[in-house]
């Protein structure tokens, strides 16, 4: 009897996402969910009153899974860690509660979820750095401060792209994201545009292209905020995670 070749039986199994990556994936899911609700709420859109229910239920389940991933890390208790878990529990509750409401209120209940999930990701990364040296390998593509800021804004659901008269434009909310930066991220496989997936900029206007992180973008950003802070030459500083205190340039 001929032994079948084993080459075709060998394959790489992707490792499970880290807690930080899982929270970033959760933020992306909330962005997609909110965009879907925005499209349903467009003037003249005809949809079932509970069209959002299945998606909201999946988000509540995904949030509870993220909470378990965080608690499974067995980090030492701290006020910051406790606050992060509470925020995630609140997200799970709001997602679940949104199923009992019609679209306008349901959209309101998850409006801030992407930013909250990203804030939790940053907090967990900080706790892991503080409690033990990170084992995260440095990504092949080292992020510049500008790229890191742009990836953070994208992950929070703050960046969309449009076209007008043959030109491309990027619209952002907190930190500035230039079209050149977006193109660089796309060229490196870290970000992508989803055509006509985000709400219009004005009533009756065309849908915009949502900019989202790719799997590689999530991995690189998670690694960037998870690595221990090391000494740097004078005059160089790490790029801080953007905060909501920056003046908004684009309304929700």
Model-derived features: positions:
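Short amphipathic alpha-helical interaction segments
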Residues: 171-199, 206-208
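C-terminal amphipathic alpha-helix
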Residues: 12-37, 105-136
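Short alpha-helical segments that sit at the start of domains
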Residues: 125-157
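Long, low-complexity or tandemly repetitive, helically biased scaffold regions used
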Residues: 35, 39-108, 131
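Short, amphipathic alpha-helical interaction segments positioned at domain boundaries
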Residues: 204-243
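Eukaryote-specific long, low-complexity intrinsically disordered regions
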Residues: 133, 137-144, 193-194, 201, ...
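Short acidic, hydrophobic short linear motifs in intrinsically disordered regions
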Residues: 158-176
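Leu/Val/Ala/Ile-rich N-terminal alpha-helices, chiefly Sec-type signal peptides and the beginnings
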Residues: 1-61
């Amino acid at each position: 009897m001929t032994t079948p070749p084993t080459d075709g039986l060998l394959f790489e199994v992707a490792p499970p996402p880290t807690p930080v990556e899982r929270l970033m994936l959760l933020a992306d899911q909330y962005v997609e969910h909110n965009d879907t609700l925005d499209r349903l709420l467009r003037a003249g859109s005809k949809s079932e009153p509970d069209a959002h229910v299945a998606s909201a239920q999946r988000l509540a389940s995904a949030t509870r899974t993220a909470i378990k991933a965080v608690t499974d890390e067995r980090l030492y208790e701290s006020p910051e860690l406790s606050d992060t878990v509470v925020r995630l529990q609140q997200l799970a509750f709001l997602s679940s509660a949104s199923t009992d409401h019609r679209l306008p209120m349901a959209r309101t209940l998850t409006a801030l979820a992407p930013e909250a999930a990203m804030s939790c990701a940053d907090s967990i990364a900080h706790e892991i750095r503080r409690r033990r040296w990170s084992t995260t390998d440095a990504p092949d593509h080292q992020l510049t401060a500008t790229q890191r800021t742009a990836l953070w804004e994208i992950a929070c659901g703050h960046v969309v792209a449009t076209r007008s008269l043959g030109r491309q434009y990027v619209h952002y909310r907190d930190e500035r994201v230039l079209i050149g930066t977006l193109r660089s991220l796309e060229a490196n496989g870290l970000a992508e545009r989803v055509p006509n997936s985000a709400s219009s900029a004005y009533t009756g206007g065309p849908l915009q292209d949502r900019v989202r992180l790719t799997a590689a973008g999530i991995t690189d950003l998670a690694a960037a905020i998870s690595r221990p802070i090391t000494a740097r030459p004078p005059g160089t500083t790490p790029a801080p995670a953007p905060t909501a205190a920056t003046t908004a340039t684009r309304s929700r």
